[in-house]
């Protein structure tokens, strides 16, 4: 049995959310909307309303704060996500994780595929699973295909941390949470992360907590 919001047309759901104003409430793990494949965007939401919704996603992402947000995370099962990362990290973290600034991007109907055999494993978290982080091994490079908010085609290769963000947010649109791909022995509270595992890579955590990392890219 679905929740009442499941039966509301997408455009009406978006209108309801935007009527409140300010950052949108973020849906937590356990809500069915996070476990269903999102509906591809094909004009179900009128252009002016869609533009407002994208801006609300951006505002909510900044307020959280986070580096990405998918529409299902605010209760809208639409295949749309936003990403942006100012990458305010020390140089050693930037180098180890390949974390470079990313401008604001809107991803409409995105999909990705690996661009090479490399894998990279790092701690990551999720706004829908607050308070926790875990190590996830992901493709080191991916080819993203999508459209932007203006309907222009996107076909681009992302590497390093931007590739991780693309994978994380696109996974949301397929009903997949990062914990589905995580090494669960690495699961750590934010407090434990700050106290014990703030190093640029998770090698020390892997040794202490007893989990394996993929090859040299880890």
UniProtKB/Swiss-Prot annotation:
It comes from the Bacteria. It is an enzyme of class 3 (hydrolase). Keywords: Hydrolase, Iron, Metal-binding, Protein biosynthesis. CDD domains: Pep_deformylase. It catalyses: N-terminal N-formyl-L-methionyl-[peptide] + H2O = N-terminal L-methionyl-[peptide] + formate. Binds 1 Fe(2+) ion. Transmembrane segments: none annotated. Its cofactor is Fe(2+). Its EC number is 3.5.1.88. Removes the formyl group from the N-terminal Met of newly synthesized proteins. Requires at least a dipeptide for an efficient rate of reaction. N-terminal L-methionine is a prerequisite for activity but the enzyme has broad specificity at other positions. Belongs to the polypeptide deformylase family. This is Peptide deformylase 1. It comes from Streptomyces coelicolor (strain ATCC BAA-471 / A3(2) / M145). The gene is def1.
